[in-house]
């Protein structure tokens, strides 16, 4: 069996990483592992990490149904870098373990890993090729405010918590610019996908 090619998809918040991954899955049948989905699973009610979070912040961090109030948690961790570091130290190892398990059991030649904090968490070694999905800062801020219903201040805090997009672009193997229509973004994905496995880089 040939070695699994591991594609990492990252980029700034609200730049379109999930859109790119969804297209890869629909158009090419590429299996997708999304770190954000895994992060929600590892903090589900009853998990050790869930309990650690409740122990640290109290029952007020939970909704009425017992699940974590992600908005409230976000307010805390994005305003206090040390709290964000603590939370990431709980979640990241569990998410990486889940991704490694998914890769170990994958029977396809290619798997895409959507990892928003790929560079920040120093996970470059987990993948063979890195796509960065990018959009201009003002467009990114507007999308984030609309998507997550955030104030400009709260959205700015979230953007400031990540590595600058310019640095992610510098470290990318391929850059996909999400600045126009979906069709234009998909054309870039098609071109980048055609180069995978050939050692090709684009963008």
From Swiss-Prot:
Kindly state which reaction or reactions the protein catalyses. 3'-dephospho-CoA + ATP = ADP + CoA + H(+)
DPCK domain: which residues?
Answer: 6-203
| UniProt enzyme class | transferase
One GO cellular-component annotation of the UniProt record comes to:
cytoplasm
> Keyword Kinase: yes or no?
yes
Enzyme Commission (EC) number: 2.7.1.24
Which pathway does the protein contribute to? Cofactor biosynthesis; coenzyme A biosynthesis; CoA from (R)-pantothenate: step 5/5
* Keyword flag DNA damage: no
Q: State the Gene Ontology terms under molecular function.
A: ATP binding; dephospho-CoA kinase activity
InterPro entries in the record: Depp_CoAkinase, P-loop_NTPase
Output one GO BP term: coenzyme A biosynthetic process
- Its domain of life reads Bacteria
Name the keywords, alphabetized.
Answer: ATP-binding, Coenzyme A biosynthesis, Cytoplasm, Kinase, Nucleotide-binding, Transferase
Q: Where does ATP bind?
A: 14-19
Q: Where in the cell is it found?
A: Cytoplasm
Q: Which family does it belong to?
A: Belongs to the CoaE family.
Q: What does this protein do?
A: Catalyzes the phosphorylation of the 3'-hydroxyl group of dephosphocoenzyme A to form coenzyme A.
PANTHER family, from UniProt? BIFUNCTIONAL COENZYME A SYNTHASE-RELATED (PTHR10695:SF46), DEPHOSPHO-COA KINASE-RELATED (PTHR10695)
Name under which the protein is recorded: Dephospho-CoA kinase
């Amino acid at each position: 069996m040939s070695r699994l090619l591991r594609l990492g998809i990252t980029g700034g918040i609200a730049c379109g990483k999930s859109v790119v991954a969804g297209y890869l899955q629909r158009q090419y049948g590429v299996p997708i592992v999304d770190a954000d989905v895994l992060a929600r699973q590892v903090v589900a009610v009853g998990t050790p990490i869930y309990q650690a979070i409740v122990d640290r912040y109290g029952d007020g961090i939970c909704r009425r149904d017992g699940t974590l109030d992600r908005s409230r948690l976000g307010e805390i961790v994005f305003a206090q870098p040390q709290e964000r570091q603590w939370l990431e130290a709980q979640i990241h190892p569990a998410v990486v373990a889940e991704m490694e398990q998914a890769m170990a059991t994958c029977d396809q030649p290619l798997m895409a890993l959507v990892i928003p904090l790929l560079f920040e968490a120093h996970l470059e070694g987990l993948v063979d090729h890195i796509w960065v999905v990018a959009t201009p800062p003002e467009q990114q801020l507007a999308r984030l405010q609309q998507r997550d219903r955030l104030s400009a201040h709260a959205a700015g805090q979230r953007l400031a918590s990540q590595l600058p997009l310019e640095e992610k672009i510098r470290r990318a193997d391929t850059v996909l610019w999400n600045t126009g229509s979906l069709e234009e973004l998909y054309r870039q994905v098609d071109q980048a996908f055609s180069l995978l496995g050939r050692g090709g880089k684009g963008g």
